[in-house]
Amino acid sequence: MKKLKLTALLVTMAMTASLAGCGNSASEETTDGTQSSQATATQEAAGTETAENHDPVTLRFMWWGGDERAQATLDVIDKFEQEYPWITIEAEYGSSDGYQEKLTAQLVSGTVADIFQMGTGWMPGYVESNAGYFADFKDFSDVFDLSTFEESILKNNGQFDGHQYGVPTGISGHALIYNKNAADKIGIDFSSDYTWDDIVEMGKKVKEYDKDMYLLTMGSSELNTMIVRPYLQQLTGSTVLVNETKKRGFEEKDLVEVLNYIKTLYDEGVASPMSTVIAYGADLGTDPNWINQKYVAAFGYSSTVETLQAACPDGNFAAGKLPVMTNAKDEGWYCNAPQYMCVSGASEHQVEAMMFLNYFYNNADAAKILKTVRSVPPTSVGQEACTELGILEGITKDSVDIIQTYTGTNDLGLTTEEEVTAILQDAATQVAYGQGTPEDVAKSTISLLDNYLSSK
């Protein structure tokens, strides 16, 4: 068995990355044994052959992640090599620190690993720079089975102009978690469809029930990701910033509208005061008001709902639907992924690399080894395998099930770059604090965004 160790990777940096990084690790993806495509038949036939029938092939596989992810991945590599003894996979792994810079240098110099893990926020910039960095999974349908993924998940994760340059390692997304006991007592229903305006009315009912309670809690980050961005997408039908044109997808009046909505949430006591929440940063579950059930619901992510639930053991929590305005032009909510897996466009062994990734995603033994080290599995067979093991249940799975029902456009690219995120988050936070009118904040925000876009 391969031992857990770091493989040193020495490269000369050809350039530095200007792409927005996101090295968020989650859990995993797994797969099941019920494969139906030609890819399955091809691999099964290949597996019956001996090493003597093939020239030896060595693949490099680069990823980041903690010890649990690393050991599980190494164990899958071992299993694959036992079934395909003519293929050797050299593992190159470590932490996320410096990973993007190393990846950039290797892509530019043509020395990148045959198989590599990719940050979702980085990929649009890489594809724009040179789509040839990546092999298209659609070109290998006889080796890699894409049918086990939901089409909408593939469309929003790793697909560019119809080319599947990456496949998601898991399913994640925005979530709303709520205290079902409190909601039932007050007469609030998050299990049915509702609008942004309905949230305000729900908040008023909470105040009538208990003036010290709030319907919602959220941090400054969620103000942007859970209100500003989806609201604008629903209102305009466009992504916030348009990658193709390098223009805004909204007008100043649209931003004024969403900022006025945020102002209403805080003026009416629908959302807990930002001055109270800000002290807890991203750890909303440590807020005593959450622990003491003074908040009915919280905006968050599928990867954090279990933490929020665990912080209040006396509560009875459920995953709720997400708000969509009447006559929305885009639902604004969508599944995304923690990371992508990619095959190098420069690899001399793309078929074998695809064979390994098909095993990684679509093999029952691999699924049982990987469990959930890269988030909720993105494939139907992977989810079934995890369900059989009893490790895919509860509020995280419920929140993922809900986010999968939405078909909004993934606003990945310019909108999610670090500078833009900071601009939008700051605008929403200013209004939440009452530090500027929606009109004034919108005007200054437009100026900052246009200045940013002019540099692109």
What is each of the regions a protein language model found here?
Residues E44-A46, T50-E52, T120-G173, D197, ...:
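Hinge/lid segment of periplasmic solute-binding proteins
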Residues D55-G66, I87-E92, D114-I115, Y165, ...:
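Short, well-ordered beta-strand elements
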Residues D78, Q82, T88, I186, ...:
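Extracytoplasmic/periplasmic substrate-recognition and gating elements
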Residues K79-S152, N181, K185-G187, P288-A297, ...:
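Extracytoplasmic "Venus flytrap"/periplasmic binding protein-like
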Residues Q106, A113-D114, F144-A182, L215, ...:
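A structural signal for short loop-to-beta-strand junctions that line the ligand-binding cleft
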Residues G132-F134, K138, S303-T307, Q339-E418, ...:
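Mature extracytoplasmic/periplasmic domains
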Residues D161, Y165-T169, H174, V200-D254, ...:
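Extracytoplasmic/periplasmic solute-binding protein
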Residues G203, T245-A279, L322:
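Glycine-centered hinge/linker elements that transmit conformational signals in sensory
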